[in-house]
Amino acid sequence: MVVTILNQLLLGHFDRRRFISNLLYIVPFSYLVQFIGYFWDWLQIPALSLLPRLILNVLGLLGVAAAVSIYQRCNLIQHPNDDLSYILRFRFLHGSAIIAQWTSYLQPLTIIVVSFFATGHLRAIGFGTVFALIAQGAIMGWSDHHVFPNLKHHVD
């Protein structure tokens, strides 16, 4: 909800369609993520050795970055965090997918750092998190030009 409000502030005006679509995305997405977790457990992915899990992790992250590139270009309905990177990219960062993605990660990174200093522990920070933080923007930018290249961004 906080990111949805931040998106509206960055737009400089209230965009009802965008606000509602951000909220509508969250609920089914949460259930999908939970279902995928159960599905991976059913396939016994967590029981695999490190190398196959790393390969699956990287392939999954490549797929997610390409998918975000596609649906950002469609710009129909977006997860609030993806919409944030989209707004930052085209309103403030001259179209740079890399810088926009890094900038959109400042909020969760701040929460991670504050939590670490408060507890002395890092939780749920693994290879996939670090890989996404470093490379997702670059993969999205590459996907913009190589995955359905005729699909263009509709900046509003």
List each model region and its residues.
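Extended, low-hydrophobicity, polar/charged segments
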Residues: M1-D156
